[in-house]
Every structure is written in C-alpha cells, then in structure tokens.
C-alpha cells in the first residue's frame, strides 16, 4: 500500500491592490514551493495603516480576484493591524513565502512564528525582474499622469 504524502502548504500575504504582472510572478513562484498556495489578503484597515491611503479595491474584491488565479488554492482576509497568528496556525503552512518588496526580516518573523508554535520555513522570493510595470504605486502614478491632467 502506497503511503500518502502530506501536501506542502505555502502561505503568502499581501495587499494585492491593482493586480499586476509582479503579483502573478510572485504567486507562481510561491506555488512552486509546494502543493497548495494559501493567500492572506490585507484587511482594508491594514492597508490604510501601512500605505497611508485608502485601498483602491476593498479587501473582498481583492480576495475574489485572487481566488480566480490558477496558482491560488485558498484566500483569507486578514485582521486589521498585525499578522493574525491564530489564522496562520489554522492554515498550518509548511512554508511562508515573503515577497521581494515586503519589509519583513525573515529571521525575526521565524522567531515570532516559533513563539506561537508555528514551525514553517520562511523564504524570501527574489524579484523575477524589477520594473515599474510591476509596482502598484507606479501604476497609480501613470494613471494619474495620463488621466488627471
């Protein structure tokens, strides 16, 4: 009898406001680290705190867009503020993938996870390419310059 292998769960988090090619490349690279990709979308309040602006799209819409991407298996909306360790525990990831532009110190995050009994590996995904086409703030800037003269 063949032993069933445990599926490797990869967790990512982010704002994912105005989806662009950089997001898709990040999600694809993260999915390649395991079998299932779970995404936690930043709560609108978290976006306001981190970005100091309103989200362009509400969290529910951002979550729905992410659910439509073939690399993504599950999507949750985070709680306002900081990382919801209880949600991370319920997801039970084997790997947490950090985006190239996310301001997390991987070692400190690993320590914080361990304090909560979460033993996931933390991996930073490198830039596939760095381009203004793959940066939400630059996309917003181009829209403003093009349509708000």
From Swiss-Prot:
GO terms for biological process: FAD biosynthetic process; FMN metabolic process. Pathway: Cofactor biosynthesis; FAD biosynthesis; FAD from FMN: step 1/1. Its EC number is 2.7.7.2. It is an enzyme of class 2 (transferase). ATP binds at residues 15-16, 20-23, 101. The keyword ATP-binding applies. GO terms for molecular function: ATP binding; FMN adenylyltransferase activity. It holds the Pfam family CTP_transf_like. InterPro entries: Archaeal_FAD_synthase, Cyt_trans-like, FAD_synth_RibL, Rossmann-like_a/b/a_fold. It comes from the Archaea. Keywords: ATP-binding, FAD, Flavoprotein, FMN, Nucleotide-binding, Nucleotidyltransferase, Transferase. Its cofactor is a divalent metal cation. It catalyses: FMN + ATP + H(+) = FAD + diphosphate. Catalyzes the transfer of the AMP portion of ATP to flavin mononucleotide (FMN) to produce flavin adenine dinucleotide (FAD) coenzyme. Belongs to the archaeal FAD synthase family. Homodimer. NCBIfam families: cyt_tran_rel. This is FAD synthase. It comes from Thermococcus kodakarensis (strain ATCC BAA-918 / JCM 12380 / KOD1). The lineage of its organism: Archaea, Methanobacteriati, Methanobacteriota, Thermococci, Thermococcales.
